[in-house]
Structures are given as C-alpha cells and as structure tokens.
Amino acid sequence: EEAVHGLYHRRLVDKELDEHFGGRLREFYLGRQVDLPDGNSLPFDQFWHLHWRVNGRLHTLSLHDALLRARQLLAPTPAQAMAAVTAHGDDHTGNLLYNPDGSRDGAISYFDPAFAGNHIPALLAPCKSLYHICYAHPNMLYDPDELRIELSVSIDDGVLQIDHDWQLTPLRQQFLTSQINHVWEPLLRTLKQKGMLPTTWRDTICAALLCCPLLCKNLLAGAGRPNPLTADASILV
C-alpha cells in the first residue's frame, strides 16, 4: 500500500475498511464547536450538514456528504482499476529546493519523500502541489492575523451563505495556469487516450483537494500554534 494514502484516506478513518469516520477527522473536528466570523457558534455535527453557497454559487454536497464521497473514492483499494505513476506525492514548494548553481535538469531538488512511491494513483499525485502552491495562501493557514479580506456569513434554512472578495494573487494565478497547462491537461489527455480515465475523475480530484487543507491541520477558529486561526481564515481556507 502506497504511503500517499496517509495524506488522504488514512486521515479519514482509523482502519482501511472502516465504514465510520476516525483519524484526523475525528481528532480535529468531531464533537467540537465551530465559531463563525459573525460571532455565532454551532456544533460541528450540525455544521457539516449545512450546504454552502459561496459568492452566489450553491455547492450540491454538504461537507458531511463530500467527506463520505472522499472516504469511498480515495480508498487504497478503489472500486475500479486506476492508473498509477512514480511520484513524490507531496511536492508543494515547501518540499522543493532551488539550487542556482545546478544544471538545468538539476536546479530543483525534492526532499521529504515521506509520501513518495512507485504506484501512486495518477489522479492523486499532483493534488497536494495544486492545493498548496496555488490555493493555500500562507495568510490563511499560518499568518491569519495578516489576512485582509471582506467576508460575511449567515445561515438560512440549512444553507451557509458566504460572500468574500478573496482572489488568487497574480503569482498564484500563474502557478495555477502552469499546473493546468503542464501537469493536468497532459495527464488527463494521456489517461483518456489510454482508456484509463475513470468516470469519477472530477469527483476524485475534488475529494483529494478537500482533504488537503481539512486534514492537514485543524482548521477550527482558535486552533493552531503559534498563530491560532481566526474565524475568517477558518471559513475561507
């Protein structure tokens, strides 16, 4: 079993075949209280059943249902055969070293290969770098007091309404464009050509991207050291 599953499925459960949640999900969230930016608070057991409408766009799955789907799709033994690759598995910029004196092919080096492997599911291999390089701004996860954002939240009839003005910085937009052009489009095209692109590929990628922040660290307001998350950072990330 590849170590990369330790970033995803193993953080959702205690044992591989469990049909209930455990792992980091239970440690971080289950039975806890969620403090919202508007000053209200509610149990996580209620919070994760809310549907989200973000800047007018309604998400079809609640957090609970999205995690149920993730537990199924990210299982180490998938329901259908899946293409695999040799990859680092956790190659965000924090795990890359740039050597300005190196050759063109050796200027960038990977380190911390804790989740590397020879048979990593191809759709999972680039997900950590996609999230952490493009979407996870450090002011969300690590320096929340420096986060500058206009954000409002409200709950109405089971829907969590969130409006915000956050946008990707120009640099992170360039990272995203580069990843799409040089990683994701070639990968998806190759898998499709070889008849190895599962019908659930979009859901699988979305499930992995959900786990990247949610199971990386406790995202509840007040959690985290040395800089506890603010309620704004908690809901935005």
Regions found by a protein language model. Name each.
Residues 5-88, 101-104:
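ATP-dependent phospho-/nucleotidyl transfer catalytic cores
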Residues 17-40, 167-237:
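Helical subdomain adjoining the active site within ATP-dependent kinase catalytic cores
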Residues 66-68, 96, 208-210:
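Hydrophobic transmembrane helix bundles of membrane-integrated enzymes that assemble
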Residues 80, 84, 89, 119-127:
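Active-site-proximal structural scaffolding
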Residues 90, 95:
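Conserved catalytic-loop position in the HRD/HxD motif
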Residues 100, 108, 120-191, 209-225:
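Active-site activation/catalytic loop segments of kinase-like enzymes and analogous catalytic loops
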Residues 110-117:
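Activation of the activation-loop gatekeeper triad in protein kinase-fold domains
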